[in-house]
């Protein structure tokens, strides 16, 4: 009975109260930029995804209104497709099953739209909304903790919770997400790194230093990014048509298109 009770108590402990499982040392990667596109209007990027030949962006209302923007990957022209106004702080977004899902930060609302951007019944999120992506079957969300949530696209109910581990510790502040090539890529809030996570084990398999993106910016662009501590990297998307990833940040004037390679 005592053994059974001890096991039950361990199950009920919060993630941080138990020792993190062992994971291999992450591989160090570099992002090799193949081209960059300067956008003609800035956005406080909270979600990023390539869909139907364009880069789509969900923004928070840090400097105005929460929006869904469509960015031309050739010219950088930004078109606002949906506007949630100033009452909601837009967060992660993803296209899945002919629908667009957009989370909100602390309002617990998930906006859903059909393929023509017509509103569908909203869903409820019991947690804070941060990053959102999907695999072949489920939505995958983050809430700023060390956990990823695998969710039903029908009602946003939780099917599985995956703790994320790096270097023997749970990795907190997981933010924007992208599922690509069998892995989950994630920004880490207030950190200039990107991580690649195993969706099976939760282990961080690789890390990417993003500071070189800031260093290669034009002086005026770098001045914008350096002007506010909130303007951190946030936004990772994958284009299966070209095989390129797209990286950006909050209020960054530029989108970077490139590939990940082993660090020197």
Give residue ranges: language-model regions.
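Conserved beta-strand positions in repeat-built beta-propeller and related beta-rich domains
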Residues: 57-62, 100-107, 141-145, 186-190, ...
């Amino acid at each position: 009975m005592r053994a059974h009770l001890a096991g039950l108590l361990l199950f009920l402990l919060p993630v941080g109260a138990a020792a993190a499982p062992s994971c291999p040392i992450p591989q160090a990667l570099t992002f090799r930029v193949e081209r960059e596109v300067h956008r003609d209007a800035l956005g406080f990027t909270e979600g990023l995804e390539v869909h139907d030949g364009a880069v789509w962006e969900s923004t928070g209302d840090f400097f105005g209104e929460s929006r869904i923007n469509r960015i031309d990957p050739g010219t950088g022209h930004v078109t606002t497709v949906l506007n949630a106004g100033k009452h909601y702080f837009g967060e992660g977004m993803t296209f899945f099953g002919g629908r667009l899902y957009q989370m909100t930060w602390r309002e617990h609302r998930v906006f859903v739209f059909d393929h023509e951007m017509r509103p569908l019944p909203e869903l409820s999120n019991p947690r804070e909304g941060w990053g959102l992506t999907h695999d072949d079957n489920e939505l995958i969300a983050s809430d700023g903790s060390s956990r990823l949530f695998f969710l039903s696209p029908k009602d946003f109910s939780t099917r599985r919770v995956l703790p994320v581990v790096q270097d023997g510790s749970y990795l907190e502040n997981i933010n924007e997400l992208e599922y690509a090539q069998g892995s989950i890529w994630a920004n880490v809030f207030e950190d200039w790194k990107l991580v690649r996570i195993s969706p099976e084990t939760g282990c961080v398999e690789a890390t990417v230093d993003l500071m070189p993106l800031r260093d290669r910016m034009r002086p005026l662009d770098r001045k914008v990014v350096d002007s506010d501590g909130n303007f951190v990297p946030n936004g990772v998307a994958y284009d299966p048509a070209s095989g390129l990833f797209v990286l950006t940040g909050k209020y960054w004037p530029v989108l970077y298109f490139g590939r990940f390679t082993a660090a020197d």
